[in-house]
């Protein structure tokens, strides 16, 4: 009998072991859909991005009008741009839900998978930031100026570093050119890191809602979960289509309809909604270097999750106290997001400071303590 090509061919074998015959826990819930949804998001963003890059000009005098030209004169250019801009928002929604799932179900105990995931998040944030600068609107320009300027808080080398990043003494043509180069390159780096992320995941196999070993129960990924992921994809692409077709500018900033002007500062400089929680943490500390460190810590704190796990149970499924804290953390992040969008005045300053404090306290102190307390209660 001839060997099955799907299982013997060097390339098809890899696809087969990752997407078809992959042994999967039978009880994984819809929260496990987000990995594949992120893959779909990445492919969508790369395709729409490539089409946009064909019509974009990375020059300060032409960038804004080239984007306008794409929307007005290119066949379906408006749709491609709207899908790309709103696809980024959907990408971040999926990423945050994916990370939330990892925190809730103790997936961070697969350390290599978790750490590559955080590196992926950082790369994604960098990609989104440099991409936001490209349309060269007011908020693009001032967002780039404010965020790159933060590097000047680094002692001794800060100012040199900023000028090196800018390619001059302010955000100008060289900055735009290099940001376009980076925005083109980084998604392919993300695709490469995704393969590493999956390689580490498939070494251990997926976690499941009970957090117990499920080797004896596993079922093939296809057709069970390929079909389930297809439903997830439909449920994700529908809001994207609705957003891109009916309210394409709902998540954008009105300032970006004005071409960049270094002489006029917008009244409220703020990033896209998916960075607002980190922006609120940055603003909550009156000292520049302190703010930058807090901003970095707000994301890098995820690296500590495996070491802060004190419970004898992996997931929070049967740990009501930890569940309460987890949802407290979610609410906390929503408050930070809201505060980040508000002007720097009373009462938003104090709310932001309190929310920043409780964010770090919950992750570093309360969750580990609660895990240890639950061990005691359960007589472990």
From Swiss-Prot:
Positions that bind a ubiquinone: 202
GO biological process: mitochondrial electron transport, ubiquinol to cytochrome c
Transmembrane segments: 34-54, 78-99, 114-134, 179-199, 227-247, 289-309, 321-341, 348-368
InterPro entries: Cyt_b/b6_C (IPR005798), Cyt_b/b6_C_sf (IPR036150), Cyt_b/b6_N (IPR005797), Cytb/b6-like_sf (IPR027387), Cytochrome_b (IPR030689), Cytochrome_b_C_euk/bac (IPR048260), Cytochrome_b_N_euk/bac (IPR048259), Di-haem_cyt_TM (IPR016174)
SUPFAM superfamilies the UniProt entry points to: a domain/subunit of cytochrome bc1 complex (Ubiquinol-cytochrome c reductase) (SSF81648), Transmembrane di-heme cytochromes (SSF81342)
Protein role: Component of the ubiquinol-cytochrome c reductase complex (complex III or cytochrome b-c1 complex) that is part of the mitochondrial respiratory chain. The b-c1 complex mediates electron transfer from ubiquinol to cytochrome c. Contributes to the generation of a proton gradient across the mitochondrial membrane that is then used for ATP synthesis.
Protein name as annotated: Cytochrome b
Organism encoding this protein: Herpetotheres cachinnans (Laughing falcon)
Lineage, opening ranks: Eukaryota, Metazoa, Chordata, Craniata, Vertebrata
């Amino acid at each position: 009998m001839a060997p099955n090509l799907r299982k013997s061919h060097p390339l098809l074998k890899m696809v087969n072991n990752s997407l078809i015959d992959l042994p999967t826990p039978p009880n994984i819930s819809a929260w496990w859909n987000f990995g594949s949804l992120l893959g779909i998001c990445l492919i969508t963003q790369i395709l729409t991005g490539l089409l946009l890059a064909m019509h974009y000009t990375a020059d300060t005098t032409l960038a804004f009008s080239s984007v306008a030209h794409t929307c007005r004169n290119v066949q379906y250019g408006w749709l491609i741009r709207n899908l790309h801009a709103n696809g980024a928002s959907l990408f971040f929604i999926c990423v945050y839900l994916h990370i939330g799932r990892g925190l809730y179900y103790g997936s961070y105990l697969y350390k290599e998978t978790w750490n590559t995931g955080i590196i992926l998040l950082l790369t994604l944030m960098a990609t989104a930031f440099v991409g936001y600068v490209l349309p060269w609107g007011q908020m693009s320009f001032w967002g780039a100026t404010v965020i790159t300027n933060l590097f000047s808080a680094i002692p001794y080398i800060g100012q040199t570093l900023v000028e090196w990043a800018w390619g001059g003494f302010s955000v100008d043509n060289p900055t735009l050119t290099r940001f376009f180069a980076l925005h083109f390159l980084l998604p392919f780096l993300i695709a490469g890191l995704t393969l590493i992320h999956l390689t580490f995941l498939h070494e251990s196999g997926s976690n499941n809602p009970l957090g117990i070993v499920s080797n004896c129960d596993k079922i093939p990924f296809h057709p069970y979960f390929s079909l389930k992921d297809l439903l997830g994809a439909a449920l994700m692409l529908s809001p994207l289509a609705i957003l891109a077709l009916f309210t394409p500018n709902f998540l954008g900033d009105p300032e970006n309809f004005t071409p960049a002007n270094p002489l006029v500062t917008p009244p409220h400089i703020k990033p896209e909604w998916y960075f607002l929680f980190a922006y609120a943490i940055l603003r909550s500390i009156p000292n520049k270097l302190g703010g930058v460190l807090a901003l970095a810590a707000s994301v890098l704190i995820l690296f500590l999750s495996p070491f802060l796990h004190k419970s004898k149970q992996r997931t929070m499924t049967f740990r009501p106290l930890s569940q309460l804290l987890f949802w407290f953390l979610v609410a906390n992040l929503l408050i930070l997001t809201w505060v980040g969008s508000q002007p720097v005045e009373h009462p938003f300053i104090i709310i932001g400071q309190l929310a920043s404090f409780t964010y770090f306290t919950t992750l570093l102190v309360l969750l580990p303590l609660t895990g240890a307390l639950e061990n005691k209660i359960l007589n472990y």
